[in-house]
Every structure is written in C-alpha cells, then in structure tokens.
Amino acid sequence: MSISILFSCGSKDNVEKTINDNQTKTELTKSEQKIEEFTVRALGNTMAEMKFDIPNITAKEGSKVKITLINESMDPAMIHNIVFIEYGTRKEIAMEAIESGMSSKYIPNNSNVIAGSDLANPGETIIFEFDAPKKGNYEFVCTYPGHSEMMRGYFFVK
C-alpha cells in the first residue's frame, strides 16, 4: 500500500503579490528617470566669433536631457537657440529654419528635429528638457539665420 501526500507551498495571493511588486518596481524606475544636465554657452559678438563653447554632448539613451543655454553675446544681433537634429540634416534644417521664421523660433516642423530651445537674446539664459533618443550620433546647431555653419556640435547617445 502506498500513500501519496501532496503539499502546496504557494497560493494565488502570492503570485498576484509578486506581479504587483514587479509592476511597482517598473513604475518607480520610470519615475526615477535620470536627468543629465549640460550647460552650453553661446560665445562671440560677431559672425566670425560666434560659437558654442562645447563641441560635443554625450547622454544615455532614454535619459532626460536638461540643457541650459547661456547667451554670453553682447551684440543685439546675436540671438541664438540650440536645436538637436538627426545627423547629416544640418543644412536642410538650417534652410527650413529661415523659411519657418521667428514665430517658430527658427525651428522647422521637420521629423529630423529632436528638440529645440526658445531664442536667447544677448545676456539671456534659456533652460529646456527633452528625452534622449535611441542610441546613435546626432548633431546640435543654432538655427538662427546664418548661424548654423559656425554654431554646431555633435550629440552622442550611448
């Protein structure tokens, strides 16, 4: 004669609790998105002198990127912005920016634009945030008319 005895160590309540705990952890991870902060200075008082003070920005994929744009120019004509774009689209974006005009902050409605700041007048500081795109190489540029050749850099997302 043999007797089989079965014991159950788990319950439906434990399974549901585990699922709920995992969902909570995921929600916390999303709400604790890392913020990467960068300060970019717009320098120069003439077309020949104007530039951003840093050539590259590197951020992690999916992070929140916080940009502080400081326009250190004194000349009233030196108005700047900073626009993050798909790599290799700078000339296209610059041309479209002129057409889009001041009312759009010289940021064209183009799918190659990732994010862009307000216009910063001389002596003004602008702060804005955006989510870093997928891993890859991108660019940043001032799209104020005539500035894109001198005021540009690379945005690397790791």
Regions found by a protein language model. Give the residues of each.
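C-terminal motif of bacterial Sec signal peptides marking the signal peptidase cleavage site
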Residues: 5-8
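Bacterial signal peptide processing site
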Residues: 10-13
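Post-signal peptide N-terminal segment of mature Sec-exported envelope proteins
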Residues: 17-38
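Extracellular/periplasmic metallocenter environments
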Residues: 17-23, 70-77, 111-158
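N-terminal edge beta-strand
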Residues: 33-64
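Short beta-strand and strand-turn-strand segments in soluble, beta-rich domains
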Residues: 48-50, 103-114
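Beta-strand acidic-aromatic groove motif in beta-rich domains, primarily in extracellular
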Residues: 76-84
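Short edge-strand/loop segments of extracellular domains
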Residues: 83-92, 157-158
